[in-house]
Structures are given as structure tokens and as C-alpha cells.
Amino acid sequence: MHKVTKFAIRHLSDKASRFVPKAGVYPKGYAVGGIHCGVKKDGKSLDLAILQNTFGKNASAAGVFTVNKFKAAPVQVSKKILKEKSGLGINSFVINSGNANAVTGTQGMRDAEDMVLVTDSVLDNPTNSSLVMSTGVIGNNLPIDKILGGIPKLASQHLGNTHQHWIDCATAICTTDTFPKLVTKRFSIGDDTYTLAGLCKGAGMICPNMATLLGFFVTDAPVTPSALQQILKYAVDRSFNSISVDGDMSTNDTIVAMANGAAGGEVIDNTSSCAERYSRLQTEIVGFAQQLAQLVVRDGEGATKFITIRVKDALSYKDAKSIASSIANSSLFKTAMYGKDANWGRILCAIGYANVTSANSVIPEKTSVKFVPVDGSDHLNLLVNGEPEQVDEERASEILQNEDLIVEVNLGTNGGQNADFWTCDLSHEYVTINGDYRS
């Protein structure tokens, strides 16, 4: 196993390292790990990961994938396998980082299929029991011999269920991330206790319309494939589809989930007789997904701020989310936040061009905007019922010095629908990182 150091992944910083967990609680019946197999050029960074169901019974799986037209080969292969098996009997995930295997033609498809074939073989899985994912530079073929040689080594020598195994797995899927993103949680449904573990990668090319990055949820709860798919889609819409770093949607973005039932209890499905257990699990996974997705924003390439856009009292959830997304993806707003400039006109501009459902979705005379500090101190009104406030620039500057900030928009429609969206600022460092990404 490999200790996480500043050299384990690109740009690991003292600031970011505070988000790396020192311990965790992990679901029963899984083995995970990560190694360096040679995809990344530095000769040492972890670049190959496996998550395996070891419970002995077929797991349920679900997935949500990018809508980018240039879907990478692993996205196409994984979608096909998931559909063919109706989500039942997917028992492992295999992931490489450092190369996206995207826009790589027929060879890319063969390489993705071979990664599945070799993984299933070394893990003694039935055929097509693994989903495959890749992340990294677009347009280059995989060094497939290195990957296919690394899979047996990883499977036989480096899989386990300790905290370090999970950290290795989370580290091995990183590209421009500054820290591995790993979250765990234990919760109860009735008399049954279950555990969730989630890991993801993402720091750039983050934009809604799922998927937005690579992410993996695994649990020891017993869940049917159809219920897991429905819950995952609902959770992703309120988490990973509610974040933005730079407005780019990747060719490879994938969120997958696996439930092996190792903790026992009544099987959770999406029928009326199981509504209470289903609702409880959905609530847990939504909150869990939001926590994990927010780590991606905190690790936004070059980011210095974590910004929550909170839209309240919209006519519909769709309107609330669309307006929040419009603000979060505004480069003018994001650069103003980096410059600690309370230029609230940029917020109103983004509200005004948001894609909303009706002419009554945004009424300027009813719209209010304010900065809300997360430290509990007084908020700062910028606009109240369409009327601009005399902004205390000194107070605004004080609020904008903080790393975390809430921008709250109240539409005053009496529709009562709310949405949160998470974003970061846009800095000089973002250009620096992406200007030499392939070097």
C-alpha cells in the first residue's frame, strides 16, 4: 500500500490535505485498492484502481453517464454491460487515470472491453461482471499492455478493506485533483445498520447535466437494481449535477453505485410496501452525494473560494436550479468572487438570462439578493424587492475574504421551491494548470 504524500497525486497542498480523512467506516463485503501501472508519466503516481464485491452474492448496480456526444469508449462499454445485465451481477469496477480512452476509435473500444475481460478473469467473475472507467487526456490510445499487466498484480496483491486500501483506490483515480476524495458513513434503517463509502475524482471539466466526473458509491445495504438506479439518479441531480467548476462537461463522466446486501435485512425496492425504507435510504444517499460532490468544488482547479448559490421561493425546482446554475457558471461572477469584488450586477445578469419555464419565473420587482456569511454574522443585502441597497463596501470586502460564502437569491414568487448549487471562483491558477495539462 502507498501512503498519501504530496507526491502521490498532482499538486497535493497543505490546504487541501485537511480534507483527506484519517480514518473511516467501510461497508462489509468489499475489497479495493490502487497501484501505479505505468499510465502516468512520472513513474510513481497511482493510476489503476479496482473496487470488488467479495460478499459471494451478486450485487446490484446502477449508473448515470455523461450526455457529451463524444462518449468515451469505457462509457459506452459500461452502459452496454449495465443495460444487458439489468443492473444485477455487476461485481467490480476497474478504473485507470492519466488517459481518458476518449475519441480513440475501434482500438479504444477493444481496450475498454479487454479491461473488463481481464478484470473478470482475475477476480473469477462471470463474463461482463465489471464496469470500466477511464479519466485523463482525451485523444490518445491507452498503454493497454501496462494496464492489462497491472490488473492481475492489483487484484492479487493490493486489494483489501482497510482505510489505506480505500485511500489508495481514491488516489488512483485522480488527475489534476489536489487530494483524494473519500467519504464514509454509517446509518440505520429501522433495526438494520448499513454503511456507505463514496469516492470520486474531479477538479476541472465540471459542469452539470450528468454526469460531471467519476464517482463511486458502494453500500452493504440490500437494494434492488431498479431502486438503486432510481435513487442514484435522484441523488445525482441534487448533488453532482448541482456543481460547477469551469462549465466544461467531460466525455468520460460517470457515477456508479453498487449494493451487495452483506449487512442483511429486508431488501429495499421501489414498491409501495417498501416506501419508508426506500425514502430513508434515498435521504441518506442524497446527503452523502452532496457531501462528496462539494469536495470536488473545494478542489476546483485554482479555486480559492467555495460558494453556495441558494435560490429560494421559485415557481418550480427546475427554475430554482436553472437560476442557481446560471449564476454558478458565470465567468464574470466567478472572477469577481476571486477578486473579492461585490459586483452584484453580475449576479442579476445571470439570473436574467437563466433558462426558466415561464415569464413569471423571474419578476425583477420581487427579486432579492444577499451575501450570507457562514460564520453566523449578519448578512449583507444587495438587492431587496428589486431595489438596490446602499452596499457597505467594507463589510462586503470582509465577507469576501472568507473561503466559504453563500449567495442567496429570493425570487418572491410564492412558489416555495428551493435549490442549492455549489461552485468556486475562477483564478489565474486555473489557466496555469490547464495551459500545461498534457506536459
Swiss-Prot record:
Reactions this protein catalyses: N(2)-acetyl-L-ornithine + L-glutamate = N-acetyl-L-glutamate + L-ornithine; L-glutamate + acetyl-CoA = N-acetyl-L-glutamate + CoA + H(+)
Pathway stated in the Swiss-Prot or TrEMBL entry: Amino-acid biosynthesis; L-arginine biosynthesis; L-ornithine and N-acetyl-L-glutamate from L-glutamate and N(2)-acetyl-L-ornithine (cyclic): step 1/1; Amino-acid biosynthesis; L-arginine biosynthesis; N(2)-acetyl-L-ornithine from L-glutamate: step 1/4
Residues flagged as site, Cleavage: A211, T212
Enzyme class name: transferase
Any GO molecular function: glutamate N-acetyltransferase activity
Keywords assigned: Acyltransferase, Amino-acid biosynthesis, Arginine biosynthesis, Autocatalytic cleavage, Mitochondrion, Multifunctional enzyme, Transferase
GO cellular component, one term: mitochondrial matrix
Site (Involved in the stabilization of negative charge on the oxyanion by the formation of the oxyanion hole): T135, G136
Gene Ontology biological process terms from the UniProt entry: L-arginine biosynthetic process; ornithine biosynthetic process
PTM annotation: The alpha and beta chains are autoproteolytically processed from a single precursor protein within the mitochondrion.
Positions contributing to substrate binding: T175, K201, T212, E301, N434, S439
Subcellular compartments: Mitochondrion matrix
Chief localization: mitochondrion
Active site residues per record: T212 (nucleophile)
InterPro entries linked to this entry: Arg_biosynth_ArgJ (IPR002813), ArgJ-like_dom_sf (IPR016117), ArgJ_beta_C (IPR042195)
The EC number(s) this enzyme carries: 2.3.1.35, 2.3.1.1
Leftover remarks: This protein may be expected to contain an N-terminal transit peptide but none has been predicted.
Subunit details: Heterodimer of an alpha and a beta chain.
Family designation: Belongs to the ArgJ family.
Known role: Catalyzes two activities which are involved in the cyclic version of arginine biosynthesis: the synthesis of acetylglutamate from glutamate and acetyl-CoA, and of ornithine by transacetylation between acetylornithine and glutamate.
UniProt protein name: Arginine biosynthesis bifunctional protein ArgJ, mitochondrial
